[in-house]
From Swiss-Prot:
Full protein name: RNA-binding protein Hfq
Segments crossing the lipid bilayer: none
Species classification: Bacteria, Bacillati, Bacillota, Bacilli, Bacillales
Gene coding for it: hfq
Every Sm domain range: 9-69
Coiled-coil blocks: none
Length: 74
């Protein structure tokens, strides 16, 4: 049986590995900008100006990277 592809994990991992600057839009409209330093099933660790913020994924609406991210869909 073929393993299902987890696009979210691939996307976040590429952002982390390539140190791609990202803007996070929260559900309340607030914007956070920085680098993804890590993530798990429930949270994203964002670093902004040397400070870390742990954001719960359920509070995030959208990730907007500064440049396009390459992921494998097959």
């Amino acid at each position: 049986m073929k393993q299902s592809i987890n696009i979210q994990d691939q996307f976040l991992n590429q952002l982390r590995k390539e140190n791609t600057f990202v803007t996070l839009y929260l559900l309340n409209g607030f914007q956070l900008r920085g680098l993804i330093k890590g993530f798990d099933n429930f949270t994203v660790l964002l670093e902004t100006e040397g400070k870390q913020q742990l954001i719960y994924k359920h509070a995030i609406s959208t990730f907007v990277p500064q440049k396009n991210v390459s992921i494998e869909l097959e």
